[in-house]
Structures are given as structure tokens and as C-alpha cells.
Amino acid sequence: GTSVIRVGAGGIMLPNHSPMVIAEQFGTLATLFPNRIDLGLGRAPGTDQRTLQALRRGPESSEYFPQDVLELQALLGTPQENQSIHAIPGEGTNVPLWILGSSLYGAQLAGMLGLPYAFASHFAPQAMAQAVSIYRERFEPSAQLSKPHVMIGCNIIVADTEEDARKLFTSPQQQFTRMVRGTRGKLPPPVDDIESFWSPAEKEQVSSMLTCSFF
């Protein structure tokens, strides 16, 4: 096993969960693996209406995202004298929070709260530069972070040759095309001819979404 690699969540969609439940779950992880857990928080529901109903959540849940982040932060932090609700385990673990986003909203919120910001380039690569700029402009130092800290989520394909890497890349290209079409499924295997899979319009849209890709 490892003893230093940081682990945690690349994305808990907080509107789908109670801050109390997340505090207890990640408090458990932080108790088992002290100082090794990170918690990334997203605002998007990340699912359809039926699944939202099954989770007993509604589309309006995302409106409370800033309040939920602050509540979660308080539950994971040092308990206050008048605090009546406690997450056990969780309380006092101070699990580092990240704000995940692909919009200017997330960038502003992360900056205002003094939290690190992770940008999802595969959703809105065109907004990346502006989002990072706004985050840095709006950043306020906090107990967790003294200066801005940005992470960019991008696609990196590694193989023996660039030709092999580009063939492997046809798997996410197909998957994103399916997403554009509104269909779901497992990650498809690579294909020799991606051009026969998508239409010119789909190619343009998917290629735009996957701009931040490196071989």
C-alpha cells in the first residue's frame, strides 16, 4: 500500500446529499487516513429527474450550494461553543475542500470562500481562461488557503506512439458523441475509423469539448 498519496473525491455533487452525511463519510475516511483526504464539491446534479427523485432531492437543491458548502465546512471544522449539531466522525478533521466547476459561478464562489478551484475543461474549455482569471481576482485568503490554487482537469492519452494514443482517444470521442446524442452506455473500445461514427456537426461539438487533450 501507499502512505503518502492523497486520496478522496474528484467530485461529490453536493446538491444530491446532506452536508451532514458527507461530513460523516469523509470524516470516517480522514480518521482512517489522516491528512490524506481531499473533498471536491460540485454544484451540478449530475443526473436526470428520475434519479433526483429517487435521491429525494429536487432541481432547486443546487440553489443552496453555497450554504451547503459552508455547513459542511463547519461540520468538519473545530466545533464552536454554541454548536448543537456534531458530525462524529468528521468534527475536527478539517478535510480540505475543493470547489469543482466549469462555469464562472464556481470560480467566483471558490475565490470568495478562499478554497482551491478545479476546472473541468472537458465541459467548457472556452471558459477556462476567464474562469481561472475571475477566481484569482476574487480570491480571499482563508484558514485553508493563503493564495489561489487552481487545478485543471484535462485529457492525457499515453501510448507507445502518438498514432496508438490517437486510436485510444477514439473511445472518449465515441462516449462524448453518445452524450451529445443523449444516449448512455459503457466506454466503447477504440475504433480504426472515428469519422464513420459521428456526423460533421457532432464532430465539431465533441472536438470543441475535448480541446484540452494531450497525446
Stretch-by-stretch model annotation:
Residues 12-14, 42-46, 102, 122, ...:
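Active-site beta-loop-alpha junctions enriched in small/polar residues
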Residues 14-77, 117, 125:
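Flexible, glycine-rich active-site loops centered on histidine and acidic residues
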Residues 29, 65, 98, 102, ...:
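Catalytic alpha/beta core domains of metabolic enzymes, predominantly
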Residues 59-86, 127-215:
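An alpha-helical appendage that flanks or caps ligand/catalytic pockets
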